[in-house]
Each structure stands twice: as C-alpha cells, then as structure tokens.
Amino acid sequence: MKGKIQCPALTGMLLAMLIVAVHSASSAEYVPRVEFGARLEPHNRIILGAGQDAASFDSYRRLFDDRHQPLLYMTYVGLCNPVATVVAWGAQVQHELTRLAPYRMVPQIGLNLTGGKDDGSGEDAAIAAGRYDMQIAAFADAVSSFKRPVFLRIGYEFEGSWNNYHPSSFVQAWHRITKVLRDRGLPFASVWCAAGAAAGWLPPEQLMKFYPGDDWVDWWGVDIFSEDEFTRPQLKAFLDAARLHRKPVMIGESTPRYVGVLSGTQSWVRWFAPMLRLLKHCPEIKAICYINWEWKEWSERLGYPWQDWGDARIQCNETVRDRWVKALADPIYLHASGDESVSLPEVQVVGTRR
C-alpha cells in the first residue's frame, strides 16, 4: 500500500527492545522493605490482594495454586446507608469469608462516607456530628463478627472532587469512626488512602489538610490506575512523605486503565512491568490490591463512567496471566495459603491514642 514502508530490521529491533524491557523488569531484585512497626505490617513482605467483587476475586484467585492465594479480599460499604444495609453487607462478607476457608483471607474494606455515586455528596460533616453513629455501631459489629484482622480505608480517595469531603470535617469523621473501633478493641489497621493522580495530585500542603494525624493513622495508601502514574514525581513525593511519617504504604486499588490485558506483551510492557518495577524499588510499599474487572461491563452495571477503561481480567490473556502469576510467586509476597497458617502480626490493642 502506498506510503507504507516495510522495514523488517526496525521491526525486529523494536521487538528485541520489548523483550529486553520485559526481562529487565522481571529479573531485578526487590530492595528490602522498610520496617515501621505499624499495625498489621508484615516483616519485609508485600501483601497481595484482589477484587473487587466475589466473582472477580474467584476468577483471579483460581489462577494461583493453593500456596499463592491473594491474602486481601477487597470489599466496599457505604457508611451512610441505612443500618439494615450495613448489617446485610457484614453478613454477606462473613458468608464469603466462610466460603473461602481454609485460606483465612483478610478483608480490605473501602468505607465510603458519601450519600451517592461520585456526585459530590460527602457526608463527612454529618458523620462528625454524630448523625451516623448507629451505622458506625453496626459497622463495628460486622467487623467484630469477621473474627480476623481487617484493613480499613476510611473515606478512600478522600481528596477526590467526586466525594466533596472537607478537610476539617473529614478529619473529625475519621476520629469518630476510629475511636469507636479502637475502644471496642477490634483488630484493624486504618489506611489513609489518597486518590493520587485521579484527583490531580493536590499539592502536599493541601493534601495534608485531610490528614487525621500520625496517632490516628496506621498505614498510608494510594490508588494507581493509568500507565503514566508510575513515574510521576508526585507519587515519589507521596512515598517519601509516608516514610517520613513512618507509615507503610498500601496500593489500595490498581488496574491497567486504558491498557487492559488483551494486547499481551504490549499490555505487559506498558503497565504490568512498570508496576513490578515500582514494587521492587519502593521499600515503603507493603501491600497491593488488583482490580480484576472488565470495566465496560461494570460501568453498565453500576452506572459509572468506566466504559473505556479496558479489560483488566488477568485470565483473559495468556501472556499477561503467565508472567503475572510467575512474578507474584516471588518470596517477598505474602499470600493466603491452603496448606499452612499464614497470619499477619498481632494487633496490640491499647485503646484510642490521643
């Protein structure tokens, strides 16, 4: 066809470069993790998790053998729902955890503080004022019923305009929720999880206005979606700040947005290899959760604008599947296991820290 230049040498060179990039990402060593002594912090390990619904979690975990199951089970609940809805959520999660025995998986809970769907209906001020105390009590009952530790991302993506939280009332709401859970002696670790690039990376001084304080936060967290986020200086600055505050970092949500898995090696080079590089070279990161979704389907189901995010289901591409499963078999990763007891450090419950 006119205007199309055939250049086998160039094509071969580009392919070779891709192969070298993939090999480099997979062969680099993990730097030792920094130890902070936080609640539920593993020693020199990275906890693996997945979600973010029961069927997608099952599809993901079936890719791994019994010794390498994801340890964190992602689940979400809105604190501003009716009490009965919060109770029903707790019962459903308990059912799923029982079904997944003997793996002893640990819930990673996204606790939403809004009254709607990404429409700026933040209820943080009402929570801080005590108007949702019955829901907080019902939520605490649910966490207690799980009889295992949980990670809790209170008001996740707190700086996002779609939530419309206000710094002072968000902090007050965080304190109110955390105090109830701690006073009941529940084995949880709170995760202060930022939206990061999705919210335009607020300047540090603005982001920290949402910070409840070191005594009220156990982990920091950030969500990572698009391929250009891995090398952003703002991400490095966030990780550096977490280290200064002596907090381990959880990647609370991750998915190859706009990349997906269906392009095989290209998908791997664009998103999965950079993610592994980030995990290998950033010793503050001690947990990561992957969203194993076909985003168009869930956009239509739930009514969110995710229709062009792509198919992130690992099982849908052999190249991505095999490389991902192999990469996560590295001993640094902490899995759930069907043939041995895998546990997180004990939580020392000492009441509410002031």
Residue ranges and their predicted role:
Residues 92-108, 215, 219-261:
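Glycoside hydrolase catalytic-domain groove-lining segments
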Residues 182-204, 248-259, 290:
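Aromatic-lined carbohydrate-recognition surfaces of secreted/lumenal glycan-active proteins
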Residues 52-63, 87-98, 134-139, 196-212, ...:
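Alpha-helical scaffolding within the catalytic cores
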Residues 30-131, 256-259, 289-290:
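N-terminal substrate-binding region of glycoside hydrolase catalytic domains
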Residues 82-196, 311:
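Substrate-binding cleft of extracellular glycoside hydrolase catalytic domains
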